[in-house]
């Protein structure tokens, strides 16, 4: 199993102990800030996840803890919630819808479930990137910029980051390779916590 991190990612021992997650090797909690000008209030989106060194997440109680953590951030993403679970990884997501309100449910999968992603942010040049992928034969199922990220990752792997213009943070799990790729925009507008 490989973990590739293209970001500042802090894994907290104290967080692990507070959540009583045994054999936990990685917790990812991303909290993202979005200012809603009309209401004058801060609305936040986020995703949570854990990766264990146990083959089955249920042995480490990871799924229950991710549900609990995701419930704690409901105020940050009131429009939708979603979960993904594989051998030793669980992801949870809370969404504030901006683009493709119906098609942007996450975690989002690609390539018959090989890749799974949670994403928050905005890719400003996603229309150009989408067109490039269409020219390469990719057929989109949604209008979401999230799906563009997955298509670019499938095509370019870690090098996909050089193509993105915007503010973003995401995590992609490759079921086939059993790798976790974490990234955020180069300025840290959408940081990992």
Sequence positions of predicted segments:
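Accessible peptide chain termini
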Residues: 1-2, 44
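Low-acidity, Ser/Thr- and Arg-rich intrinsically disordered low-complexity segments
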Residues: 2-8, 12-15
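Compositionally biased, low-complexity intrinsically disordered regions
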Residues: 5-6, 23-26
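Exposed, low-complexity/repetitive linear segments and helix-based recognition motifs
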Residues: 10, 19, 33-34, 142
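A periodicity- and composition-biased signal for non-globular, repetitive helical segments
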Residues: 12, 23-24, 36
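Polybasic, lysine-rich low-complexity intrinsically disordered segments
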Residues: 17-23
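Short, Lys/Arg-enriched N-terminal segments with co-localized hydrophobic residues
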Residues: 27-43
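N-terminus-centric sequence/structural signature that marks the extreme N-terminus
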Residues: 39-193
């Amino acid at each position: 199993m490989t973990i590739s991190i293209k970001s500042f990612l802090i894994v907290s021992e104290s967080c692990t102990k507070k959540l009583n997650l045994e054999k936990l090797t990685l917790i990812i909690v991303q909290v993202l800030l979005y200012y809603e000008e009309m209401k004058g209030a801060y609305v936040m989106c986020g995703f949570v996840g854990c990766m264990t060194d146990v083959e089955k997440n249920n042995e480490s109680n990871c799924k229950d803890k991710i549900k609990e953590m995701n419930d704690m951030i409901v105020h940050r993403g009131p429009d939708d919630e979603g979960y993904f679970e594989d051998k030793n990884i669980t992801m949870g997501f809370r969404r504030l819808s901006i683009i493709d309100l119906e098609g942007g449910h996450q975690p989002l999968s690609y390539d018959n479930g090989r890749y799974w992603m949670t994403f928050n942010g905005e890719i400003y040049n996603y229309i150009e990137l989408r067109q490039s992928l269409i020219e390469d034969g990719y057929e989109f199922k949604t209008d979401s910029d999230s799906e563009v990220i997955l298509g670019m990752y499938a095509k370019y792997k870690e090098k996909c980051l050089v193509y993105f213009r915007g503010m973003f943070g995401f995590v992609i799990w490759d079921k086939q390779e059993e790798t976790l790729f974490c990234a955020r925009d180069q300025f840290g507008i959408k940081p990992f916590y």
